[in-house]
Amino acid sequence: MPILPSPNPPVEPYKIRMVEPIRLLPREERLRRLREAGWNVFRLRSIDIFIDLLTDSGTGSMSIYQWAALMTGDEAYAGARSWFRFRDAVRDVLGLDLVLPVHQGRAAERILYGELLRRRNARIVPANTHFDTGRAVILNQGGVPLDLPSPQASRREAYPFKGDIDVARLERLLKERSRDVAFILLVITNNTAGGQPVSMDNVKTVRELADAYGLPLVMDICRFAENAYLVKERDPRYRGWSVRDIAREMISYGDHFVMSAKKDGLANIGGFIATRDPSLYEDLAARVVLEEGYVTYGGLAGRDLEAIAQGLREVVEEDYLRHRVEQVRYLGELLSSQGVPIVEPVGGHAVYVDVLEALPEMPRSHYPADALAAALYLESGVRAVGLGALAFAREENGEIVYPEFELLRLAVPRRTYTNSHMEYVAASLARLLREGRRKVKGLRVVKEPRIKGIRHFLAELEPIEPV
């Protein structure tokens, strides 16, 4: 398999001290596994995956300092030392005082979003673009998630901050229906729109609009460090700032926060809710006790709190972030140079293939992003994830409304794979699209869950044509 070399591949700023064997199953075996999984890559076993780019959430490698911190975990039910170290790390790195740990990000979304929807007695939640779990949480609590991506987000040409919210559309919504809006949400970085960063100017403008209409501004900050690094890289005004200072500046404009520590906490599990409102904090704390655990552990072991505390301090180190962003960019450059259409510029955690351009002949009703994900696994053993019609299409007035984007996401776990893994992925996908478009078979849904917004996780599919 030809691999296109790069003149400047990124150099890993770490040594490998422990390894996990991986193996590439024969194609016939991969086909059998795919059939058993209902042609849904979420349902595959990890031992049957050669290179796993399904998600960067909780799948990265921890540092020796995080492993050492695990051994100091205090497992007391209440008031554990590990809780105080976790709290202090959130304060020091992010500048947030009122924090509640939870077992992962979607628990934070469920508790915070549910409380805000009840308090405002309003349903609409505008966002730069909702990600799948947050969207599902809002839908299943009676809310209406509304995507207002930047006009530049859907354009192929590079633009530094495609993750922004469309301020003009947001302002128009607030002028017409502010009473129906529960809160404004910024997802940082904007995962669904290609892992793109949100600019500081956009955050400041949204803050002004929130103040003008008396609305809370909520931030999903699970990739706060990657966003801050990209601001430093793409906005000349912040070139001399540290990543930590940029992150704290951006976070200073928010009211309430959700965080999955499985991303920029560099941990395998965990998350938190934070707020600036003491009254809301008390109500959220009660919900955490009811649904997650006591307020000083929130469903996590003390050792997990220790790993997150250390991870939050490591994630703002610029040597780490430079390699993180450059490795993902390297994968993007390899794909683009071989003719694979991707969202540009490449964001912080993943490369997104524009499937509508890659497979223009396939109708949206055949779920092209997920069809490409299945074909990529079958032909190479690589697992990626489709983010398109299967995940985000909805029925409205008896008709199917398809999302603006149909993307294949190649999410790179942190500190886990090397450049040669990226080269294998790029060569495999480029070959599939160059030589084997006929191998990408459209899919139909055989079975799906009744709960809204999660069918791409659990659906069983089958090819429309024989494989």
Swiss-Prot record:
Gene Ontology molecular function: tryptophanase activity
UniProt keyword annotations, A-Z: Lyase, Pyridoxal phosphate, Tryptophan catabolism
Enzyme Commission number, as recorded: 4.1.99.1
SUPFAM superfamilies associated with the record: PLP-dependent transferases (SSF53383)
Modified residues (N6-(pyridoxal phosphate)lysine): 263
Pathway this chain belongs to: Amino-acid degradation; L-tryptophan degradation via pyruvate pathway; indole and pyruvate from L-tryptophan: step 1/1
Pfam families found in the cross-reference section: Beta_elim_lyase (PF01212)
Catalyzed reaction equations: L-tryptophan + H2O = indole + pyruvate + NH4(+)
Cofactor: pyridoxal 5'-phosphate
Claim: Lyase is one of the keywords in the record: yes
Membership in a protein family: Belongs to the beta-eliminating lyase family.
Protein name: Probable tryptophanase
Taxonomic source organism: Aeropyrum pernix (strain ATCC 700893 / DSM 11879 / JCM 9820 / NBRC 100138 / K1)
